[in-house]
Amino acid sequence: MELLLHLSELSAEPLHAQISRQIRAQILAERIAGDDPLPSIRALAREHRVSVITVQRAYEDLEREGLLRSRLGKGFFVAEIPGGARREMAVRRLEEALGRLVAAAEAEGLARAEIRAVFERLLRAKGSTR
């Protein structure tokens, strides 16, 4: 299986976090099916020119989240996740991310009405996909 990952060493986000974030998004969007094998740690590290430890950390983070499972001697596989649980995970992550953004915006003095207006403007600009 080939994973579509776009990694940037210029990003403030650590490489292992970029890897886990992008794999997580593909799993939650069901672009990677349950029980699909992931590339070996070494293969993914070689393909993206990162250290084995970086990929291992990303895979282990996703395993702790319940998105991957490891099979001794066989590697990492996407966990079987019911559709409802996938949506709950995605909603929870969205709430966490938006919570951080709202807190940062409020710390900079923006009112909730301004935050809401920005959010709604972004949604309109993005257009409806569902």
Regions found by a protein language model. Name each.
Residues G84-R87:
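Short, charged/polar, Gly/Pro-enriched secondary-structure boundary elements
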Residues I19, S51, L62, A79-E80, ...:
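Generic signature of intrinsically disordered, low-complexity segments enriched in small/polar residues
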Residues R31-D36, D61-G73, F77-I81:
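Beta-hairpin "wing" of winged helix-turn-helix
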Residues H16, H48, Y59, F76-F77:
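Aromatic side chains
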Residues P37-R69:
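N-terminal helix-turn-helix
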Residues M1-P37, A43, M89-R130:
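Extreme N-terminal segment that seeds HTH/winged-HTH DNA-binding domains in transcriptional regulators
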